[in-house]
Amino acid sequence: MEGLLSIIIPSYNEGLLIDNTANVVVDIMTEHKIPYEILFVDDGSKDDIWNRIQAASKKHEHVRGVHFSRNFGKESAITAGLTYAKGDCCVVMDCDLQHPPIKIVEMYKLWQEGYEVVEAVKEDRGEESGIHRFMANTFYKIISKLTNIDMMNASDFKLLDRKVMLVLLNMKEKNSFFRALSSWVGFKTTQIPFRVAEREAGESKWSTKSLIKYAILNITSFSSAPMQIVTICGFIMLLISVIFGINSIVQYVNGTALGGFTTVILLQLFSSSIIMICLGIIGYYIAQIYDEIKGRPKFIVSEEC
């Protein structure tokens, strides 16, 4: 089965990588005679990446580009790629070539065999700082528990059949999590391993702050489980109150003086902290609902090439 392959490459401030990435992918696709298009999605970058994408589009007839009016985030860039892709199937990959393009050939062959989702699974996480690795492992352990999907070595490097692309695009939620949703939808799926390569140039745009924000957003957008923390905390506070109440009654019956300015203050501080945490969790979900009902687009395209 032959079919057009759309290679979607979200990009943000990675102008130095565009030429090499385009050349490498074009050479591999040409060598293996795979009908393809490359779709760069510029996520409102501040460097000269859009000029480089336009130049690559003029140099290579199969290279296209989409330019956002501002930065909307990687998830929105992936959604835009799925929207503008013309292929019978698509591959989503990073611009820095840490997702080895040669693996696309293997993924395409598996699609030809009838698989509708081909997931590239990390054999290792490559070179990362200790805190980055710890946070990533913690996040994926949590999301795996919440979704009952093994996300420990998952990546955005995936091939999707056109029908899977359409299913994802029909999900109208504003805050989507592509890595989890593309597994959650099901379909005939297989996996291939890959080793994370070193970046060709530049540095990762993910800071500790952005990773934490990304983790919280995706956990709350994909699962309501954190809301159960509020209920659990309520039961814990009730249990503590009952224990202290019984203790106070016993002391009163025994004629023991009830002590306790320090105890009262500590209990108030503890209960207030729990209440504030619970309100924060509820508030985050309310903010998510607010984002959904505003009905704003997930991205705005200012230019195409």
What does each model-identified segment do?
Residues 22, 34-45, 66-67:
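Short beta-strand/loop segment that forms part of the nucleotide-sugar
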Residues 1, 177-305:
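Hydrophobic helical membrane-anchoring modules
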Residues 14-17, 45, 100:
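Donor nucleotide-sugar binding loop of glycosyltransferases
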Residues 6, 35-37, 62-64, 116:
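Structural signature of beta-strand start/N-cap positions in the alpha/beta core
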Residues 55, 64-70, 74-84, 89, ...:
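Acceptor/aglycone-binding surface of glycosyltransferases and processive sugar-polymer synthases
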Residues 1-27, 33-34:
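N-proximal low-complexity "stem/linker" segments adjacent to membrane-targeting elements
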Residues 42-51, 97-98:
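A conserved acidic beta->alpha catalytic loop
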